[in-house]
Amino acid sequence: MELHIWPSDFGLPTIDVVSLQFLACSKMCASPVRVIQSTRPWRSPSGELPMVAQTEGEAKPVTDFEKFVDILKKCGQDVVIDADLTTIEKAQLDAFSCYLHHNLYPAVMHTFWTDELNYNTVTQYWYASHLHFPYNLYYLEKRRKKALRLLAGKNDTEILKEAFMALNTLSTKLGDNKFFCGNKPTSLDALVFGYLAPLLRVPLPNDRLQVQLSACPNLVRFVETVSSIYLPLGEDELKRQQANRKMWQSRISKAKADKEAAKTTEEASESLPEEPPMRDAILFTLGALTLSLVFAIHTGLIQVSVEEEISE
């Protein structure tokens, strides 16, 4: 079985949310899946990564997380994901997964795909540099339109408010535990890790969601725990990512500086009195001249004489 995921960066084995969920789940149950970093999403039936290619028989590739979890349960490895959960706990897990998809996932998509500053500074640059031209233009446009459709009808404030509540709910549920269902990871832990890890690790100029996540120390500890136990990076990969760190820091710093400059300019323009439009100024001038002329004639300052033509 092969798991095709997006490449690694920013201290993560892959920067994609769903790719992280697939990878974390496979590692938590010690599945002998072969991981392949790919930049060819067109090979997937959904046109997206991750994709699980099953080498046995003629099984179709899998791109759905729940279906992947079902496959892992039937693989026969020693560690079976979610095997120790009761029926009630499994129902709670399903309910929590649905809650996160509706309240946290939209904010993650907004942060990386529809926030103009984050998209132009990080997302667009990263994917454009990993995909060949002109396919990168098509793919970025497709992904962004998909995110915009997902968020249609919601404003930024509403999206972030729901996400903040979701993070607080996650923090409360985790408490002081190592994982969300005790001391043994479940598919919920893989799901949550995929949502949180990019928010925590990827540098962003608009970092409101990152700040809120950082204010929940137990969630930060959870991400670090999963990363160190199940998804550690090799030395070569760490060196490669370290080489790109200055470039990303420069891009983020420039984006933040441009943001502050634009904010200062906007505040300065708002503090200036509004100048009347040119049309209004011209009409006002003509009106004033007309009134002055009428007043002058009425008071006798200007006299108008009419001479009759004498016919011979």
Curated annotation (Swiss-Prot):
* One Pfam family matching this protein: GST_C_6
Top-rank taxon, per record: Eukaryota
Protein's organism:
Caenorhabditis elegans
Give GO BP annotations, semicolon-separated.
Answer: mitochondrion organization; protein transport
Alphabetical list of InterPro entries matching this protein: Glutathione-S-Trfase_C-like, Glutathione-S-Trfase_C_sf, Metaxin1/3, Metaxin_GST, Mito_Protein_Transport_Metaxin, Sam37/metaxin_N
Q: Which residues cross the membrane?
A: 282-302
This protein is called what?
A: Metaxin-1 homolog
Q: Which UniProt keywords apply?
A: Membrane, Mitochondrion, Mitochondrion outer membrane, Protein transport, Transmembrane, Transmembrane helix, Transport
Q: Which Gene3D superfamilies match?
A: 1.20.1050.10
